[in-house]
Amino acid sequence: MYFAYGEKELSYLRGKDKRLCNAIDRIGRIERAVDPDLFSSVVHHIIGQQISTKAQATVWQRMQESLGAVNAATLLAAGPERLQSFGMTFRKAEYIAEFAAKVQSGAFDPEAIARMTDAEAISALSALRGIGVWTAEMILLFCLQRPDIFSYDDLAIQRGLRMLYHHRKIDREHFEKYRRRFSPYGSVASLYLWAVAGGALSELKDPRPMKKTKKESRRSAARGADNGIDSNL
């Protein structure tokens, strides 16, 4: 299953911005896989924080092969020590076990998240240990398929904006200008800015000075073009 969008969203974005229009036409349709199961999506995102996509897939595969079904009951039965043995940090294992306990006890209802507004869902998800605002936003996009997710905390989106619009820096004011321009289809704009940041338009370079903070360097190394900032780690 892929993130659902069509000509309506693309036509809207083309009409709003010439540079994004050119990027859309040159890159073509982008297919990004989604996971419609919120429970597994939360677990998958906790596993994937600050590691490569390949490492994330390896840990997830080990978990599935060992536990069979990945659900609250099997995760609680496994416990943090066994979860850690699949290749994640003990802290992540604790976060996952705690999340499973909340779901099993009814303290957290995954189905209720789907009925919430974006702001409500982000607040509820980021209240979980191990889930910050950026991760919550990615869950809304790649699980719930919310149409207007455009994350200021996503370093690759900021990089894509710098490259496409030749900014040396994207501050909050710049970002909000683009967020308003692309709304209500910020999620589709995000897909194309991630592609730009990943080198889909090879002639575009990042005009930002090369020096990075230590935090940004760790994020970039771990997540490639899909990196973000999450303070709730």
Where are these regions (language model features)?
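Short acidic alpha-helix initiation/capping motifs at coil-to-helix transition points
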Residues: 1-3, 36-39, 73-75, 114-117, ...
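Short, surface-exposed helix-loop/turn micro-motifs enriched in polar/charged residues
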Residues: 31, 55, 75, 110-113, ...
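A general alpha-helix detector
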Residues: 41-46, 78-82, 120-124, 138, ...
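C-terminal accessory module of base-excision DNA glycosylases/AP lyases that mediates lesion recognition
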Residues: 1-30, 94, 133-233
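Short amphipathic alpha-helical interaction patches enriched in hydrophobic/aromatic residues
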Residues: 46, 79, 83, 107, ...
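Alpha-helical ds-nucleic-acid-binding substructure associated with the helix-hairpin-helix region
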Residues: 19-23, 51-52, 56-129, 181-183
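A positional/architectural concept
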Residues: 8, 14-68
